[in-house]
Amino acid sequence: MKYCLPCLTVAALAGSLQLVAAGEITGKITLKGTPKPELEIPLTPSCGKINPNKVTTRHYVVDKDGGLANVFVYLKDAKAAPATGEGPVLDQKGCMYEPYILGVVTGQKFKVKNSDPELHNVHPTPKLNKEFNLGQIPNGPDITRSFDQAEVLVRIKCDVHPWMFAYMGVVDHPYFAITDKEGNFKIAGVPDGKYTIVAYHLKAHGANPGVTQTLEVKGSAKQDFTVEIPAAP
């Protein structure tokens, strides 16, 4: 069965819903279309000394088989549940935020590190949560914060270095994942039931809600998606 949304394609292939192991949803996100080349980012002289590598935008990170990284995948209608384990860590390293995409549960504390010998500032610009803007000295103490409202995605920037961005998915349960460099994802510990699963890619979907598909978990399930590059205006 195939569902088409504006600029998006969901591929729900026959047999893509499979029982595997208890409590997991696994899948793969692939990109349809050829993205434009990433743009090179000119660094300041001080950042160029810290990071001598070529730095580019990260709009579409795709492997040789079309696997799409940095997709935030989550259950839209899962019941609220507390976080399991420690919250994520966002690092400023080589004058870049790492990782580019990360996720957190509402109320869960996350940390921001500065591993650079360079002043940065951490400036999330949420629409539903409380904004903050804090300087962080070179190799200084971690910043620890949390967000109280579900929001996909919260932009985090550095006003000192305008090319530095990261994006955080905030949901009220731990049933989410970010695709790896091959486009694979795994959501663990999911209770049995029917869900709407969402795959959201920042560049492809923008203000759109992402690609959605319904699935039923009985022990575990598999769900693949295809994300289509939007047509040029």
Where are these regions (language model features)?
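Extracytoplasmic copper-binding redox domains, predominantly the cupredoxin/blue-copper superfamily
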Residues: 20-233
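C-terminal segment of classical bacterial N-terminal signal peptides
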Residues: 14-20
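Hydrophobic helical h-region of N-terminal Sec-dependent signal peptides
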Residues: 9-13
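Bacterial N-terminal signal peptides that target proteins for export
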Residues: 1-8
